[in-house]
Amino acid sequence: VRDRIDEAFMLPNVPASGIQRIRGIEGQSGRLTGEAEWKRTIITDGGLVITPLLAFQADADYFNASSASLQAIDDMAAARGLTADTRSSFARFMATAGLELRWPVLFTGPGSSHIVEPTAQLFVRPNETYVGGLAVPNEDAQSFVFDATTLFERDKFSGYDRIEGGTRANVGLRYSGSYGNGWTTNALFGQSYQVGGVNSFAQPDFVNAGADSGLETARSDNVGLAGFSTPGGFSASLGGRFDEQTLAMRRSEGKAAYSGLPVSVSARYTFIQAQPSYGVPEDLQELSFGRSARLAENWRIFGSGTYDLEKNFFTGDGFGFAYDDECFSYTMTLSQSRNRDTRELTQSIGFNISFRTLGDFGSTTGSFAQ
């Protein structure tokens, strides 16, 4: 059960853009989710790798919001010419039949080997339900990024509150190389197509997840990634999302990291073109960094920070500690973030307990805990 009290429900507009969004509700919402997946890999005599897939997800949701939150939902729906379909409870399901084809081709040379792998996927499923009328209280799928790392995901949403529906094809070309001196290289380039049904990423929800993402049209933006790693623990990569027609840069990201003992550090530069409907009214440039230090065999501390290069201030930072052994892990994090427009400070605490053979529960406040 989630119980969120968020002042954002009183202010559904993003001040800088005028686009209505609802980042949280006052009240209670809960969801019970069950998911199952079956897949099998078949390799033909010609080297073609065929992977059929079947998946099923079922949810039971309830929603009990305050009158002010319900009014904010009605206002957002009216602004988009919709009728709010708010429900106190509902059930939904998504069944998927998928097929993936990969054809890895190996090339070898003096001191190196290279694999080029054309890949195609097709996922057939019904349309997503309860999204056109803002019925789903989207809380755990608000964060959304479409790039090369998510191109071949069956469901590209970041959480369970949204479920990708409709028939979609993903195509791309993978490359990996290894060298005698221990270096490795990798690259990926591809595109996604909505070939049938309703495009989930073009449907409204509380935060407009999917809007201006590069997936809201029938033919997605192009995404690419290239990187390398060294035997000394250093790695770097460059990735980007490019307009499907003009190839103009929509998003880019550069990463560099060093992983060693006892210290690991990383840095990342990100450019995001304005996404007004998603709450980014102007171009965004950020510099993020992270560090981790192992204090003993099972204990480590870590931290991260993000600096806004456009407005010249830290938008977020945090730190934490973790314990890991062969059967149990525990993570505690403390973080704070600042609104880019108002500089309002939000602080949070998160934890996660994981049993290797049983599962995990809790929530961490950021990816720097990884």
Regions found by a protein language model. Give the residues of each.
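Outer-membrane beta-barrel proteins and related beta-barrel translocases across Gram-negative bacteria
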Residues: 1-370
